[in-house]
Amino acid sequence: MNKKILETLEFDKVKALFEPHLLTEQGLEQLRQLAPTAKADKIKQAFAEMKEMQALFVEQPHFTILSTKEIAGVCKRLEMGADLNIEEFLLLKRVLLTSRELQSFYANLENVSLEELALWFEKLHDFPQLQGNLQAFNDAGFIENFASEELARIRRKIHDSESQVRDVLQDLLKQKAQMLTEGIVASRNGRQVLPVKNTYRNKIAGVVHDISASGNTVYIEPREVVKLSEEIASLRADERYEMLRILQEISERVRPHAAEIANDAWIIGHLDLIRAKVRFIQERQAVVPQLSENQEIQLLHVCHPLVKNAVANDVYFGQDLTAIVITGPNTGGKTIMLKTLGLTQVMAQSGLPILADKGSRVGIFEEIFADIGDEQSIEQSLSTFSSHMTNIVDILGKVNQHSLLLLDELGAGTDPQEGAALAMAILEDLRLRQIKTMATTHYPELKAYGIETAFVQNASMEFDTATLRPTYRFMQGVPGRSNAFEIAKRLGLSEVIVGDASQQIDQDNDVNRIIEQLEEQTLESRKRLDNIREVEQENLKMNRALKKLYNELNREKETELNKAREQAAEIVDMALSESDQILKNLHSKSQLKPHEIIEAKAKLKKLAPEKVDLSKNKVLQKAKKKRAPKVGDDIVVLSYGQRGTLTSQLKDGRWEAQVGLIKMTLEEKEFDLVQAQQEKAVKKKQVNVVKRTSGRGPQARLDLRGKRYEEAMNELDTFIDQALLNNMAQVDIIHGIGTGVIREGVTKYLQRNKHVKSFGYAPQNAGGSGATIVTFKG
């Protein structure tokens, strides 16, 4: 479609109304490239996508898409053989994450029938191995240590060397305190230095890196740390080299999939654009129109999207109707009506919703032409009439039966009699060529043309004679009146003068009376139509309310089932808690032996069911299935605390995972799902089995690192029981340093336990304050 009509109708401003609802740069780019098409299948597809997205929002009103940046240039660089930097990898990582989130959303979607949208969701790719590779880059733009073994080794050495430098400098701060201007370690030229008083500069051997402005302070790098600093500099160079190697290696792994990733990004943007259209529908009460096969247009309560508080109007352009001629005075809204028709058609043929009521229909036109406004050229010295006529001549040479033509103030700018005759001749030519046309004019002669000519219809814009203001209501089938006499009379002109004027045009009175009757009939019809629409709106509200109630009832059923399970679990927990209290009371009041108390406690636990049998509960089954690991899931390797991605499951049930550049084989118990870590509220109690270890007598170890407080205390209780049953003399409890909450809980527990003889922190080489050694009474 020609660009001039899009500029005339300000289509770019209309597209900008959708931008606030977009979440991705891909969607924004597709919106900006959006243009009307005459291909019916493309328009139908866009309409179907919007309707399906509306249905999706009914079930998932908070459906959203992760924001993504444009990656077309990144993928192009990959295809050309370039290696990517960290920032570019993060862009790809975000796209892959968004793709996976959308796939997961689609897999769990229920109660919605999708056809067009399903094609897009199902075309998204899953790259579990690439996702594992890209875990090497964290969101802060840092390459993780687990990206490669060599990088981890280098960074460990850097850390050790830096620790040595700090230790040496701290010792020197204490030893040379009287020689320093300040008791701090400074940094100069990337080196750690001491601020030495100038009078003592020869007392501390080392390299001078700087002198203060006053000359009183000399910044010296002590000789003891020079060699270490050089080692660190060398290691930093090795680190940079290894990071470049990692970037090159991952670039090579991603390169074969560049086109697929770019396609995924386009699909994400397309889904985002469809989502934005539906958000616009919700915000502006817009609709997806029906598509007419025969250029029939029926717009119900249509509004101009760029006009604030626009008056809604009905427009019906039947199959046989070739022209609608809007007559009447200026400033009544004729031009806005013209633009509303054209812009609504452009929006619909671009696959966008329109501001109208349900039941509206649009046609398909190969081209839309318009001559609107004063486009005269000062440089060409053209008059208003010449400017319009030049444009119209050009249009008449291009239009055909598949075009829509909009003409504003046809024949204006010249002698009224000649202008009216020319306007009628142009309209007649268009009628004979069966070209749909909407034209505005203030020539009264065209009223008769509209009445007498087949397939041509008059129309006007309503004017309120009581307030002397236009109402901007479109009155199809009713020719316009100037209302000059009524206006003059209300403004105070003498009735004698008005009477003389009306007598001079008595021959037109019959026509005016007919027009007045038509206006009254149109107003009556409009009132009836408004009443019908009110009833329809009430019905729609009731239908939505019933649907909402139905969905709420279903959700309440699921909630009740979950609540029943929680209540059952609470009862079990209460019973176990009461049994613990009973046993504590027995222990305090009697001389029962420890193993007898533990055996009694175990028997009580057996009385309580481990879980409530809700195997037939579909909601719980779905939740359980959702927690099960699957290919593509992000995981945390428990032994390393590093993130990775599951790439495949082996026949023996174990999983292969990509952790940075390292591929690992893991059992399910050796990793945890990232999503499960974030979402699970209740974890099944895990009991660490006490094992005897070789060495100095019987020993046992419990690792509580990474546990929640309640979980850690439960495991500690069970662990101590088992240690006593196995007659252990001593056990180790690893709780880490962290925030100190679990360490404090362990201390309080051991203080209360009467079977504990003593406890204390482990030696520095065995964990220090991160571990506690417990000795039991004999």
Swiss-Prot record:
GO molecular function: ATP binding; ATP hydrolysis activity; ATP-dependent DNA damage sensor activity; endonuclease activity; mismatched DNA binding; ribosomal large subunit binding; rRNA binding
Superkingdom of this protein's organism: Bacteria
Domain Smr: 702-777
Swiss-Prot/TrEMBL keywords: ATP-binding, DNA-binding, Endonuclease, Hydrolase, Nuclease, Nucleotide-binding, RNA-binding, rRNA-binding
GO biological process, one term: mismatch repair
Broadest EC class assigned to this enzyme: hydrolase
EC number(s) on file: 3.1.-.-, 3.6.4.-
Residues that coordinate or bind ATP: G328, P329, N330, T331, G332, G333, K334, T335
Matching SUPFAM superfamilies: DNA repair protein MutS, domain III (SSF48334), P-loop containing nucleoside triphosphate hydrolases (SSF52540), SMR domain-like (SSF160443)
SUBUNIT field: Homodimer. Binds to stalled ribosomes, contacting rRNA.
Family: Belongs to the DNA mismatch repair MutS family. MutS2 subfamily.
Function according to Swiss-Prot or TrEMBL: Endonuclease that is involved in the suppression of homologous recombination and thus may have a key role in the control of bacterial genetic diversity. Acts as a ribosome collision sensor, splitting the ribosome into its 2 subunits. Detects stalled/collided 70S ribosomes which it binds and splits by an ATP-hydrolysis driven conformational change. Acts upstream of the ribosome quality control system (RQC), a ribosome-associated complex that mediates the extraction of incompletely synthesized nascent chains from stalled ribosomes and their subsequent degradation. Probably generates substrates for RQC.
PANTHER family: OS10G0509000 PROTEIN-RELATED, SMR DOMAIN-CONTAINING PROTEIN
Protein's recorded name: Endonuclease MutS2
Species, as recorded: Streptococcus pneumoniae (strain JJA)
